[in-house]
A protein has these predicted regions:
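Short, basic/aromatic beta-hairpin or loop at an interaction surface
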Residues: 32-44, 282-299
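Trimeric viral appendage architectures of receptor-binding fibers, tailspike depolymerases
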Residues: 1-26, 35, 207, 347-361
């Protein structure tokens, strides 16, 4: 697909506000990268004096296919560098415009909402045309956007207490349509095997995440001293780990777990409850695979393999068999798509991680 260039006729973005300017026939390179629940960008190179190159200016938009199956997406131009009669263009998907809209917090306490209910009740400063949907029906106490001022982007997934932080779903964007899903992608009956269709992979182990203990603490209000104090729980020991010395990871318990809880340092009331909360938080932290990771990153770039995977999408799952006979399922966590050639340049699979939840006393 030859990329198209547009300008907007309104500060309130919508598909109807996009005014078509022409085709970038002088485009020599156009690559779209999308990462799971993260950045969504397009980089392009255009010959300076080619058709519509004069329309390649910041805050105009490039429309291009991001992968073999999705509709063309709009990307806002935010940087243009001219060198040797070539324009190097950097853009970001219109989803990033969510960070330019503030949510006015008007509530005095957190609201119990499902993701769709929460979005419906937001009070945004600027009108917008994002259409939100979700198949997640669980309800949780949500502060962001209700008791805490934040941007729309922070509310969706850019901060602690966001929908992504609370519900752990996966986003799929189709221009202004936002889908927040329990799980995105399909399980594919496809195997990547060392020595067969994997030519290389990278395994990284770091002592920074190899520890012996996790020590969680919480900050709560003391009714006796009339001030916030910190209560620490006994460290959880992780055994069968590779740490040969005592190596402690200090973990602050998220405020949302102890919100509204008070203690009395004179009588001791509330202390055991808070310590138990710290212990549970430490267990969840360890079980969440944030520690002791051995990462095996696989990047698929061989054309023959990419041909087999052309109809795959971000978050699809495949089976990987490595040289040490380890077999595991892994999600596609990043796609790099050549819009001009209409094929993937690279697919990156998620890391395999050592699970520490089985090693906790």
């Amino acid at each position: 697909m030859i990329p198209l260039v547009y300008e907007t006729t309104s500060r309130i973005l919508s598909l109807n506000s996009m005014h078509y300017l022409g085709r970038l026939t002088g485009c020599t390179e156009c690559t779209v990268e999308e990462s799971r629940n993260a950045d969504y960008t397009l980089n392009a190179s255009v010959v300076k004096n080619s058709e519509c190159a004069n329309s390649v200016v910041i805050q105009n938009y490039i429309c291009a296919k991001p992968n073999p199956t999705d509709e063309p997406q709009f990307f806002e131009i935010y940087k243009v560098v001219e060198k040797n009669n070539v324009l190097s263009i950097k853009t970001k998907h219109i989803k990033h415009n969510c960070y330019n809209n503030i949510l006015a917090a008007g509530e005095t306490s957190a609201q119990l909402y499902s993701p769709a209910e929460a979005y419906e009740n937001l009070d945004a400063l600027f009108d917008n045309n994002y259409v939100f949907s979700s198949d997640i029906t669980d309800r949780k106490n949500i502060k962001l956007g209700f008791t805490q001022v934040c941007t729309l982007g922070d509310f969706l997934g850019g901060a602690e207490g966001s929908l992504l932080d609370l519900f752990h779903g996966e986003y799929k964007w189709n221009n202004f349509n936002v889908s927040f899903l329990k799980s995105r992608g399909k399980k594919r009956a496809y195997r990547l095997k060392w020595g067969d269709n994997i030519s290389s992979y990278e395994k990284t182990q770091s002592s920074e995440t190899t520890i012996s203990h996790v020590c969680a603490y919480a900050t709560v209000y003391d009714e006796f001293s009339k001030q916030d104090i910190q209560i620490i729980a006994d460290p959880y020991e992780i055994f069968e780990q590779k740490s040969k010395t005592n190596k402690l990871q200090v973990y602050p318990v998220p405020d949302k777990l102890v919100d509204g809880i008070t203690v009395n340092s004179s009588s001791g009331d509330g202390y055991e409850f808070v310590k138990n909360t710290c212990r549970i938080a430490a267990m969840a932290y360890i079980g969440g695979d944030k520690l002791g990771e051995i990462k095996s990153n696989i990047k698929v770039d061989a054309e023959a393999v990419l041909d087999d995977m052309q109809q795959f999408n971000l978050c699809d799952t495949v089976t990987v068999i490595l040289s040490d006979s380890i077999a595991a399922e892994s999600k596609i966590v990043k796609t790099t798509y050549d819009t001009l050639r209409e094929q993937y340049k690279q697919l990156e699979l998620g890391s395999f991680k050592t699970k520490l939840s089985d090693f906790v006393k």
